[in-house]
A protein has these predicted regions:
Chain B
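C-terminal beta-signal and adjacent terminal beta-strands/loops
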Residues: 676, 684-704, 721-725, 729-800
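Signature of Gram-negative outer-membrane beta-barrel scaffolds
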Residues: 404-514, 641-643
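Periplasmic N-terminal accessory/gating domains of Gram-negative outer-membrane beta-barrel systems
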Residues: 112-117, 121-179, 183-216, 233-234
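A beta-strand signature from Gram-negative outer-membrane beta-barrel systems
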Residues: 99, 155-156, 200-241, 252-254, ...
Length: 302, 800
């Protein structure tokens, strides 16, 4: 009777700025490391943005005093890394030269804890799912000492948890800097809150689904990020995570997320967006085999 | 400061000038005015001396006092909706006259809108106030058929809300947290059930509601926007009454009656929701079978010790519970308790001492038996408030007193259980003391001119604990912490003093017209931290500290009041301008939930609000009601927000607040067809609220992120809001017939009668669903209506 209702509209928007966007979340991993430099698009444009070509992009390890020139590819500037270039504790600079101006950003690669394990739990039917089901968690301990920031990425059966509401971050063992939990197992919302999809990927199915069934796998990566990147992603979370429905009451005002990409000319009026960060990565995964499932059930009934 | 001093001196001069003339034989006639049917005190009833232009009104406890020269007088007691009463007095000594007025039989001719004298709006010094008695509130068609105090005041000029489901209300461009909501003088920190759909006040226990939008007397303070003063019934001191109702959302029951006839009485009123009806609001977020309910219990008792002493004890307990299972859920609620002691030191000096406790808390829990994450927040206050009314003479009524409030804030409790092991990581509690002393005089200077002038000295002390010191940064970024240290427990970390002058005048141009004006300065020492589209139950209260200055507001208002056809019609026009300082705003991505460094993410700015309120009311006849139109602006200027291209300094430009609603039209009409059937209707038209539309989208970190060219805030408006509600009441359906005692009625209401999908917000998001990495992503704009259909409701109410 009181259901809220929503419908899509096509309002006319102000003129877009179409500014340069630098998407540079690099890691210490081997293989291809990519920096995407594109232009922002009019808000309702849904095509993939094209790479801005003809730029000079350089990654500098300020601590080791080494620099790497990135190669222009079809949709990114990249490095094919065969020997490690990212080291915990090192400071890095990304330099982007356009014909008119030079932009740079600084990031520090911070430590990352290992993942002890990925585990599954057996649950009887509850208010979320009306049948017995398995849920997953990962176990990892934040090292002692405050100020560690992490971005936790995960994949179920190889599909990335990339929905806005699945952006999972930790500050020390908890969620944000103002919540002082340090040097212990990540809090439950971080361990389990974002990797148990109860909604089906099929839009036709509205009932809650068991997050994991026998045969599914989960792979988790913890990326260390620096404080500036943490603040950036935290603000980004509020901008992209629009629950809709009654949840809109809890949404915060729309505003621009920060950037650490700066012109080398302090008087520059050019706006750029995007972020540069260097992450150390730890990873672990496990498949919910029938053996794992039986063990979880046994543990539950103990 | 110069202005303050000037006003203080002026006040003193006026007082001295008007010293009572002791030379003559002066005697006082005083007493209480009550309802003869149930003993309830009559607030704001008039007492006039026949043949002379002398009179007074009863205070909130029904007390009056007039001092006159020796002689014979006829006193005329009046209260709208009651038979007038006259009493001859031969005044040769101080005389106590407690009077009981009889409710009028002629219901159809009665003014339904408010009590008071028929020309109260002309003669009273007060302006920028709005009063509703519970009888008129009960007549309005209500959302889901539930009579609601807060929803009713939203029909008054200058009062708005950002939409259905939003908690609280906005007054003259102020935010929700700038309203002080008092229930029998105890502040209620969160006035809503079920987010903002219903208010926490049980109409069966409410007697009188008064809203001060401006011209606030000196005895009130602590918030910069408004004071909503709700008074509870005392309980029938003559006979037992049981009243209640069965509605679509609540079922209600109230019992009142004498403990000892005319000496002591009580009222207990309770409500509880039928959860499943409303749970459907949450269809998107929650599954079926969600346990969800809310309830409140209101109780009051009073004891008439003797002629000079009366005590009252009242309490409120309410809670909203939304539980998924024993380890997951959300709940919140208020608790208040007030003790009051009315004492007459003499016929001329009335005093009231109030002591109260008020608490608000909420909590979330998430997890299972081994892994649980619980967070919450709480604010508690203990308050003592002595107040004196000194009825000096017929021309002066002095009010003075003080207030001391002790605050305890629990900004964030956090209990974390991981693999069976529990750690408590709650943030440190914070303590503060607020105090005030004030004096105010109502002075009748001439037949035409009356003044109310007062001064309030307020004080706030933020007490010991951990002190955080932050450095400067570009506005809009998190401020860096530069020092963190312990301060002794009861030591003063930061304190503030402020003088708050209050001044009102009423120039009576004729018996049917007056010109009124006021200046009000208010300070606010505690802040409601809310960075969401609408105020919600998880907003936390935060004291002023070494990092947050108290808010301040100066308001001037000027009004013209005119009555026509023997007070059948009341018209008024008021213009106001409000300057606000040290308004709280937030950096982008501020974490206002549980955050010990919250202050590093707060911004401070100034605000301004101005507008014009036009109001017309028809008081008598079968058709009564009012129309109002408010033209208003409300804007903020905060560095770090809406700063355009100024990347370096980020000096903010003025931007409209979320509750800036240019045009606001309200209509309330009541029609009494006959003794049995009456109709009512409300209509609201409100300009769309401002919101921010993006211009661009960025691809970064694997997400599509909105971007706003030129860093604008609130650059667009959502479509206008308008809604019609209709109501019908059929009296005495079962009771009152065939010799059955008591009365009852069936109230039928239709909310949103023409089923408009009023927009609550327009939001921008990427398409829903899982998009494979690297695929193009669509972005959409969605218009949301919280209530998108006609909502009919039926309720049965009874009293016997």
């Amino acid at each position: 009777m009181l259901a809220s209702c929503e419908f899509e509209i096509q309002p006319k928007l102000d003129t877009p700025e179409e500014l340069m966007v630098v998407d540079a979340f690099l890691t210490d991993q081997l293989g291809r490391q990519e920096v995407k430099i594109t232009r922002s698009q009019p808000y309702f444009e849904s095509s993939k943005p094209e790479l801005i070509t003809g730029l000079s992009v350089t990654l500098e390890d300020l601590t080791a005093d080494v620099s790497y020139a990135l190669i222009e590819g079809s949709d990114s500037y990249y490095l094919d890394v065969s020997e490690p270039i990212g080291f915990v504790g090192h400071e890095y600079r990304l330099v982007v030269e356009t014909p008119d101006e030079t932009f740079e950003a600084i990031a520090k690669m911070n430590r990352v804890p290992g993942i002890d394990s990925v585990g599954y739990e057996f649950n009887e039917a509850n208010f979320l799912v009306d049948q017995d089901h398995f849920t997953a968690q990962f176990y990892s301990i934040d090292p002692e000492g405050t100020g560690d920031c992490y971005w936790i990425k995960a994949w179920k059966n190889g599909n990335y948890f990339g929905k806005p509401e699945e952006l999972n971050m930790a500050y020390d063992a908890s969620v944000s800097p103002g919540q002082p939990i340090d040097g212990q197992l990540f809090v439950f919302p971080v361990r389990a809150g974002f990797i148990n999809p109860y909604t089906s990927d099929d839009p036709e199915i509205s009932e809650s689904q068991p997050p994991y069934v026998v045969g599914d796998s989960l792979y988790v990566e913890i990326h260390s990020i620096d404080r500036a990147a943490n603040d950036f992603l935290y603000a980004l979370y509020f901008q992209i995570n629009r629950m809709g429905g009654f949840g809109e009451i809890f949404s915060s005002p729309l505003s621009n997320v920060s950037t650490n990409i700066m012109s080398t000319d302090p008087g520059s009026k050019t706006n750029v967006a995007g972020f540069f960060n260097m992450s150390a990565v730890s990873a672990s995964g496990r498949r919910l085999t029938s053996t794992v499932a039986e063990q979880a059930k046994t543990k539950y009934y103990e | 400061m110069k202005l303050n001093r000037l006003l203080a001196i002026m006040g003193l001069v006026c007082l001295l000038h008007s010293n009572p003339i002791y030379a003559q034989d002066q005697f006082t006639v005083s007493g209480y005015l009550r309802d003869s049917s149930n003993g309830e005190a009559l607030i704001g009833a008039t007492i006039r001396i026949t043949g002379e232009s002398i009179g007074t009104v009863t205070n909130v406890y029904g007390f009056y006092s007039i001092t006159l020269s020796k002689g014979n007088y006829v006193l005329d007691y009046r209260y709208v909706g009651y038979d007038a009463f006259t009493q001859s007095v031969e005044l040769n000594s101080n005389t106590r006259l407690d009077i009981e007025l009889k409710p009028s039989e002629q219901q159809l001719e009665a003014v339904v809108i408010s009590g008071k004298a028929a020309d109260d709006n002309i003669s009273n010094i007060e302006m920028s106030t709005a009063e509703l008695d519970i009888k008129s509130i009960q007549k309005m068609p209500a959302f889901a058929g539930e009579v609601d105090v807060i929803k009713s005041i939203q029909l008054l000029p200058g009062v708005t809300t950002v939409g259905e489901g939003a908690a609280g209300f906005n007054v003259r461009g102020g935010s929700v947290g700038q309203n002080l909501v008092l229930l029998d003088e105890a502040p209620v920190y969160q006035s809503s059930h079920l987010m903002g759909f219903f208010s926490v006040f049980n109409p069966d226990a409410v007697k009188d509601v008064k809203l001060y939008k401006g011209g606030v007397p000196a005895q009130y303070g602590g918030r910069v926007s408004s004071i909503l003063d709700i008074r509870m019934k005392e309980g029938n001191s003559k006979s037992y009454d049981v009243s209640g109702g069965i509605g679509t959302v609540f079922s209600r029951l109230a019992i009142e009656g004498p403990i000892k006839k005319d000496k002591a009485s009580f009222i207990v009123a309770a409500r509880r929701s039928y959860a499943d009806v409303i749970a459907k609001v949450f269809t998107d977020a929650l599954s079926d079978g969600t346990a969800m309910y809310f309830y409140d219990l209101t109780a009051k008792t009073n004891y008439h010790i003797n002629e000079n002493n009366r005590i009252y004890l009242s309490g409120y307990w309410g809670r909203d519970v939304l539980e998924f299972d024993e380890n997951q859920g959300f709940d919140w609620g208020n608790r208040t308790a007030s003790f009051r002691w009315n004492h007459l030191y003499s016929d001329k000096l009335f005093s009231n001492l109030t002591m109260f406790y008020s608490n608000y808390d909420y909590g979330f829990k998430f997890g299972d038996k081994d892994d649980l994450f619980q967070i919450g927040s709480e604010v508690s206050t203990v308050n003592m408030k002595p107040e004196f009314n000194w009825f000096l003479n017929t021309n002066n009524e002095l009010t003075f007193g003080g207030e001391a409030i002790m605050y305890l804030f629990e900004p964030g409790t956090m209990i974390n259980k991981s693999v069976g092991e529990t750690t408590n990581s709650s943030l440190e509690s914070r303590r503060a003391l607020e105090a005030a002393i004030y004096a105010s005089n109502n002075q009748k200077v001439t037949e035409q001119l009356s003044l109310q002038y007062g001064l309030r000295l307020s004080y706030f002390n933020y007490l010991g604990g951990t002190v955080f010191e932050y450095g400067d940064t570009i506005p809009g970024n998190t401020k860096p912490i530069v020092d963190e240290y312990q301060y002794k427990k009861w030591g003063s970390i930061a304190d503030f003093y402020n003088l708050e002058p209050r001044l009102s005048f009423n120039y009576k141009m004729s018996t049917t017209a007056s010109l009124k004006g006021s200046f009000t300065r208010m300070n606010q020492y505690i802040h409601l931290i809310s960075n969401t589209t609408a105020s919600t139950p998880i907003d936390v209260w935060q004291p002023s500290t070494n990092n947050i200055d108290p808010q301040a507001a100066d308001q001037v208002a000027l009004g013209y009041f005119k009555n026509l056809s023997s007070n059948e019609f009341e018209l008024s026009a008021e213009a106001y301008y409000k300057w606000m300082h040290d308004q709280v705003d937030y950096i982008d991505g501020a974490d206002v939930f549980v955050n010990q460094y919250l202050e590093s993410q707060l911004l401070s700015g100034k605000g301004r609000a101005y507008g014009l309120e036009l109001y017309g009311k028809k008081n008598q006849g079968r058709l009564t009601g009012w129309m109002s139109y408010t033209l208003g602006w409300t804007e903020l200027k905060v560095d770090g927000i809406n700063y355009g291209g100024d990347k370096v300094n980020r000096i903010g430009d003025w931007y409209p607040t979320r509750y800036d609603q240019r045009h606001n039209v309200k209509l309330a009409a009541f029609y009494e067809l006959n003794d049995k059937v009456s109709f009512s209707a409300n209509f609201s038209y409100i300009s769309g609220t401002p919101t921010t539309f993006p211009t661009d989208r960025l691809n970064v970190a694997g997400y599509v992120v909105p971007y706003i060219n030129n860093n604008e805030r609130n650059n667009y408006r959502i479509p206008d809001y308008h809604r019609l509600d209709l109501g019908m009441s059929i009296n005495n359906v079962w009771r009152g017939k065939k010799g059955r005692s008591g009365e009852d009625n069936i109230a039928i209401s239709v909310y949103n009668a023409y089923g408009r999908q009023n927009p609550f917000s327009i939001y921008f998001s990427q398409e829903r669903g899982r998009i494979p990495v690297g695929s193009p992503v669509e972005t959409n704009a969605t218009q949301l209506s919280i209530i998108g259909s006609v909502i009919p409701a039926i309720a049965y109410n009874f009293k016997f």
